[in-house]
């Protein structure tokens, strides 16, 4: 039925174009009458099929548990304090500052369409390719998205924006409790969160096991433990219903293989800021697929922002790496993040240790891929490169179509379209861009689960086709000539101008913030003993 109606709409558009092109002025009355009848027919068709999608989103936040302060929970957040006892691990961790991570890749300048896709949202100001763990705190300070706050209660972002950036976060949650941690502005964390992603993010560094050289894996962020419990419930029910074997996913009772992957789910996941206190929450109650998470957001009426052009109620994916990995062949076969990105290697002292320079598996091929695959490095690299190209090609086509849909929706609003007319098309835009972002925001999805990524992108193309078909009917009804002209967004500067972003103003404010505010934060942190200089390299 859906395909049939899409065909009907396309036929209506073609007939309308031909009528405008070939009928003489003597036939204007007939043409207008025929056009009106076509539009009425299309409107009835859309109402019959898409009534369920036209309900206005009303946010109904799910009540989340809030952990109180736990003063007895000790978390040592200063990474340098473990350098002497674990030099191989520490020095390899510091190496995440080297190589490709030294250079910032300005993704929005390489692909200006991103600026339009995130119109009205802070990501439109600046979006960079990810760097090594060593830079987590530096990069969140430097990015234009976090603004230029002057006081602890100033600035555009919530405290939650720190939550993945380092071991000072679980330390603060333990000291303050979740409510006092989340219910604040980002700037409040400036003097406190100064150590980048490191030891205590993954290990119980105060435990006897850790002192004896054992991994002592621990998740100290309460919201992550809750999310894994919710995921365990959702997947256990699905696996039982479909007769599949099930692995326990609740961290504290999970097997070692699951724990080694779930540690990375501290951060490499999709999440949103829930309720008035902007509490970090993982939308896993239904499962981890793009459809599961979309349904979760739609059911509670959650919206990250309203798009500045289309007025669509948008969702912003974060980095659903754990989700996509778990859906792919590596995840299904128990090959974890650690196996590929943190292999066992031998140090200069002859000791075997886990390499903490999180890196591309091809950079340590003999210790990673070659453990399972008998193909050559060149052969496997060619396969991965080919998959990446396939994903990028489809992703680019979806980007292009969604960008056009935003401008077409704006043209419809400008021509007098009503909220009732637009709701279904805007939901399709929401769902199309969500599918694009779910795949685009994933680091290495083309490797972790290319078949999953391509399937999600294909469904995104279906959604944006639905949106543009409905918009074409609305535009025709309101007398807008199609195709709608898209402004020149061929460079980042042109795209920022089209989207009304004064990028130089943003950059100047950030520069002043980095010169005046950040040094104060670091001085306060040093006075508290939270920030220390790294040991001299031997």
Curated annotation (Swiss-Prot):
Heme c 2 binds at residues 199, 202-203, 356. Pathway: Nitrogen metabolism; nitrate reduction (assimilation). It catalyses: 6 Fe(III)-[cytochrome c] + NH4(+) + 2 H2O = 6 Fe(II)-[cytochrome c] + nitrite + 8 H(+). Heme c 4 binds at residues 337, 340-341, 448. Heme c 5 binds at residues 330, 369, 372-373. Residues 1-55 form the signal peptide. InterPro entries: Cyt_c552, Cyt_c_NO2Rdtase_formate-dep, Multihaem_cyt_sf. Catalyzes the reduction of nitrite to ammonia, consuming six electrons in the process. This is Cytochrome c-552. The lineage of its organism: Bacteria, Pseudomonadati, Pseudomonadota, Gammaproteobacteria, Pasteurellales.
């Amino acid at each position: 039925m859906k395909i049939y109606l899409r065909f009907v709409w396309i036929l209506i558009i073609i007939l309308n174009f031909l009528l405008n092109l070939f009928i003489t002025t003597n036939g204007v009355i007939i043409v207008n009458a025929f056009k009106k009848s076509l539009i009425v027919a299309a409107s009835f068709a859309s109402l019959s099929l898409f009534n369920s999608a036209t309900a206005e989103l009303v946010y109904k936040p799910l009540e989340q548990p809030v952990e109180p302060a736990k003063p007895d929970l000790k978390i040592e957040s200063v990474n340098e304090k473990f350098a002497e006892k674990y030099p191989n691990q520490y020095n390899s961790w510091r190496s995440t500052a080297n190589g490709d991570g030294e250079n910032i890749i300005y993704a929005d300048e390489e692909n200006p369409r991103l600026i339009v896709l995130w119109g009205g949202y802070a990501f439109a100001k600046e979006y960079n390719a990810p760097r090594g763990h060593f830079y987590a705190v530096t990069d969140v300070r430097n990015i234009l998205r976090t603004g230029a706050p002057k006081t602890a209660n100033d600035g555009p972002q919530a405290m939650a924006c720190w939550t993945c950036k380092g071991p000072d976060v679980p330390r603060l949650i333990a000291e303050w409790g979740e409510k006092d941690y989340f219910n604040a502005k980002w700037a409040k964390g400036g003097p406190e969160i100064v150590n980048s992603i490191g030891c205590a993010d993954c290990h119980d560094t105060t435990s006897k096991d850790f002192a004896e050289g054992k991994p002592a894996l621990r998740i100290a962020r309460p919201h992550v433990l809750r999310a894994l419990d919710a995921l365990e419930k959702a997947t256990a029910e699905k696996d039982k219903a479909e007769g599949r074997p099930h692995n326990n996913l609740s961290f504290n009772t999970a097997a070692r293989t699951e724990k080694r992957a779930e540690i990375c789910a501290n951060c490499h996941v999709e999440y949103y800021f829930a309720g008035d206190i902007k509490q970090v929450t993982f939308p896993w109650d239904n499962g981890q697929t793009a459809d599961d998470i979309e349904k979760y957001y739609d059911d509670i009426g959650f919206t990250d922002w309203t798009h500045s052009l289309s007025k669509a109620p948008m969702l912003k994916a974060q980095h659903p790496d754990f989700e996509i990995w778990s859906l792919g062949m590596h995840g299904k076969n128990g090959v974890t993040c650690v196996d590929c990105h943190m292999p066992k290697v031998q140090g200069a002292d002859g000791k075997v240790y886990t390499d903490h320079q999180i890196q591309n598996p091809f950079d340590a091929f003999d210790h990673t891929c070659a453990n399972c695959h008998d193909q050559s490095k060149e052969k496997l690299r060619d396969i991965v490169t080919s998959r990446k190209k396939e994903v990028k090609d489809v992703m680019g086509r979806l980007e292009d179509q969604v960008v056009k849909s935003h401008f077409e929706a704006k043209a419809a609003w400008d021509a007098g379209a009503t909220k009732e007319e637009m709701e279904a098309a805007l939901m399709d835009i929401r769902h199309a861009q969500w599918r694009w972002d779910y795949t685009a925001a994933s680091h290495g999805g083309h490797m972790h689960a290319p078949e999953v990524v391509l399937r999600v992108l294909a469904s995104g193309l279906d959604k944006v086709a639905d949106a543009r078909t409905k918009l074409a009917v609305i535009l025709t009804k309101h007398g807008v000539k199609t195709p709608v002209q898209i402004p020149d967004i061929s460079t980042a500067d042109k795209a920022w101008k089209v989207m009304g972003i004064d990028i130089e103003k943003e950059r100047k404010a950030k520069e002043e913030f980095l010169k005046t505010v950040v040094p104060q934060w670091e001085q306060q942190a040093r006075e508290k003993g939270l920030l220390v200089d790294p040991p001299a390299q031997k």
